[in-house]
Amino acid sequence: MTLHNNSTTSPLFPNISSSWIHSPSDAGLPPGTDTHFGSYNVSRAAGNFSSPDGTTDDPLGGHTVWQVVFIAFLTGILALVTIIGNILVIVSFKVNKQLKTVNNYFLLSLACADLIIGVISMNLFTTYIIMNRWALGNLACDLWLAIDYVASNASVMNLLVISFDRYFSITRPLTYRAKRTTKRAGVMIGLAWVISFVLWAPAILFWQYFVGKRTVPPGECFIQFLSEPTITFGTAIAAFYMPVTIMTILYWRIYKETEKRTKELAGLQASGTEAETENFVHPTGSSRSCSSYELQQQSMKRSNRRKYGRCHFWFTTKSWKPSSEQMDQDHSSSDSWNNNDAAASLENSASSDEEDIGSETRAIYSIVLKLPGHSTILNSTKLPSSDNLQVPEEELGMVDLERKADKLQAQKSVDDGGSFPKSFSKLPIQLESAVDTAKTSDVNSSVGKSTATLPLSFKEATLAKRFALKTRSQITKRKRMSLVKEKKAAQTLSAILLAFIITWTPYNIMVLVNTFCDSCIPKTFWNLGYWLCYINSTVNPVCYALCNKTFRTTFKMLLLCQCGKKKRRKQQYQQRQSVIFHKRAPEQAL
């Protein structure tokens, strides 16, 4: 904020015209008569006298006792609420791990600046108003002004950082989110404070040494180099009008981008419903299935294998490692594979926090099918017709034998709507007699025999369809949750910006008016406008609580001293989960 001073007739705002200070003697009134100084009653009772420098020695600054009580009570309450509110923010960040997000680090920095204003600036300014003069000396004056301006400018810089962070998080999720770490946030916060300190502290503390003398009169406290209204207005432009303009533009862009993502999410949900009703057809026109003609043909050629793997469905974003199942050397070398490409494809579609929703993200699942002697990943394959399916009944029987071993487990995973585990336990089945039969059987099958393979393909397609629908719903849910989080962060930002604009605008408007008319604004209005800037530090914690449920519940927990209870409940919950895990572990091993 910009404390405006350019004259010597007023202790706080020296630029105010002397026409607002009416002396009783000038008006022809007796010395005991009460008059008005701005909106304050100034008593000229006996015992009040002026010192040689023109300042009064009255400790009440010419105010009545009731006026002093009212001012002290009101400003004291505001300072106390500011201190408690911002301490709650800092402690909440410390005790609640859910609040330790990158965005909340910026709010923590803002709370620290507001706490400094509540502890130091508000109380010293109240003393200045009540006494109507500065009685703490030049060094204390310069230190107060330096701390006040650095903390206030740091608040503005933190708001700018929050606005840019929200803007880049919304508009550049792929590139910015990868760089958005707590370390980088700490660097940005440090830069905000360093810039604020460099801009104000040296000039406030050492300007009198730069120019060779101190021009601030005794009993007054203001920044020496802000002695001209034009300079004061220039600092107001740089410290308020320009940041507000930038933050408003950024918030408008954030709002438009959020609306765009909301529409795209609605389109994704609609496409999911359409795909479900149209037999799960990919937007490009290709149908998704977990079986293919090429896979069936290759399975026929490998019917002489000694051991057969089961049909596995994989849904993971990590590299798949082959099982330790013993295989022939030639098949081990030819069938080994890595699904990094599949994982990357799935990751691109599943990580809703890291990308925009586009047409390329409609391919929402990849299914890995491991059949006898073959491991591959299938994408955009068409369901084979009955004419093209030629699989020996012997091989079909061997596959069916092993499918029965996992029928209950796989069926339960699909029917219950649960996701498939990352890996199924390997249950190799020795089928020596079946293999001998397969060696002597004829590879070619008639069309009538090929129809027997249709139930297998349709079963696989049904499992794939259910699995893919579950995957689509999970991805859509993640995108929806991400959008909700972005909206909440935008709401918090909007509340903070609105409070900042409302509380800082009146004072800066008066600075603008004073540039053209230095006698148009009473001293009382200057005091109120300057105090209103301080009230912004009081309102900010309220904005956090209103817009963030986690902050709200943590505030309530701290105010009601429920930290110990919550910790005990958390420990009890963890103990129960540990018992459940140990009970389930032996069952899963069977």
UniProtKB/Swiss-Prot annotation:
Motif position, Basolateral sorting signal: 275-281
GO terms assigned for molecular function: acetylcholine binding; G protein-coupled acetylcholine receptor activity; G protein-coupled receptor activity
Membrane topology recorded in Swiss-Prot or TrEMBL: Multi-pass membrane protein
Entry superkingdom: Eukaryota
Intrachain disulfide bonds: 141-221, 517-520
Compositional bias ranges of the Low complexity kind: 334-345
InterPro entries reported in the protein's UniProt record: GPCR_Rhodpsn, GPCR_Rhodpsn_7TM, Musac_Ach_M3_rcpt, Musac_Ach_rcpt
A single Gene Ontology CC term: endoplasmic reticulum membrane
Region of interest (Disordered), ranges: 323-357
Main location (coarse class): membrane
Record keyword Transmembrane present: yes
Side Cytoplasmic, residues: 92-104, 165-184, 253-491, 547-590
Modified residues (Phosphoserine): 385
Extracellular side, ranges: 1-67, 131-142, 207-229, 515-526
SUPFAM superfamilies: Family A G protein-coupled receptor-like
Compartments reported by the entry: Cell membrane; Postsynaptic cell membrane; Basolateral cell membrane; Endoplasmic reticulum membrane
Pfam annotation, one family: 7tm_1
Positions of transmembrane segments: 68-91, 105-130, 143-164, 185-206, 230-252, 492-514, 527-546
Name this protein carries in UniProt: Muscarinic acetylcholine receptor M3
Taxon lineage: Eukaryota, Metazoa, Chordata, Craniata, Vertebrata
Gene from which the chain derives: CHRM3
